[in-house]
A protein has these predicted regions:
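Conserved GNAT acetyl-CoA-binding A-motif
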Residues: 89-102
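Conserved glycine-rich acetyl-CoA-binding loop
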Residues: 47, 69-80, 92, 109
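Conserved active-site alpha-helix within GNAT-family acetyltransferase domains
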Residues: 101-129, 133
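A generic "binding-loop/recognition-motif" signal
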Residues: 13, 59, 102-103
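Conserved acetyl-CoA-binding loop-helix of GNAT-fold acetyltransferases
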Residues: 74-87, 99
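Short amphipathic alpha-helix that is part of the acyltransferase structural core
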Residues: 1-30, 41-43, 139-142, 146-167
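Membrane-topology and secretion signals of cell-surface/extracellular proteins
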Residues: 62, 134-135
Length: 167
């Protein structure tokens, strides 16, 4: 069972990120780790209990490998991991993020919107239409979000706080 604080930190252990993702039900696309630009882990002590990666996929800056161990869910870890990724994207002057969301509600709550039919959607959906998991607990959605540091539409936030830090 989960106990104690969980810290968010950059990680270079991409194999552990993949193992956690697969253990949480994500499909390993087999893409090269060279496409991963940065990754973060959520650590309970030394144990990796959550992860997320910023990946470049055919010219799209994508969120990938977002997973949280079942014993650690509903504690705001996904939001903290995503916030770290979005802050890094801003530092890198990335203006748009993309995701193939297996859990679209989380990303929709972060301001993502559906990607219309076209090349970007085709890239994001990739092998999904042929995947054995499709329709068996997996209903992925191609989503995108324009990012900047302006905060939520009503402009409310504390000094130095990005709007998604308040989960």
């Amino acid at each position: 069972m989960s106990a104690g604080p969980v810290r968010i930190a950059r990680t270079e252990d991409l194999a552990a990120v993949r193992r956690l993702g697969v253990a949480c039900g994500l499909e390993d696309s087999g893409r090269s780790d060279e496409q991963i630009e940065a990754a973060w882990g959520a650590f309970a002590g030394e144990r990796l209990v959550g992860a997320i990666a910023l990946e470049r996929n055919e010219g799209l800056e994508t969120v990938n490998w977002m997973a949280v161990d079942g014993d650690y869910r509903r504690r705001g870890i996904a939001g903290r991991l995503y916030a770290a990724l979005e802050r890094e994207a801003l530092v890198r002057s990335i203006t748009r993020l993309w995701v193939t969301a297996r859990a679209p509600a989380f990303f929709l709550s972060q301001g993502y919107t559906a990607v219309p039919e076209g090349d970007e959607r085709d890239i994001l959906m990739g092998e999904c239409p042929r995947c054995a998991q499709l329709g068996r607990g997996c209903e992925p959605q191609a989503l995108t979000k324009r990012i900047d540091d302006s905060g939520p539409p009503d402009g409310s936030r504390s000094e130095g706080e990005t709007w998604h830090d308040r989960d």
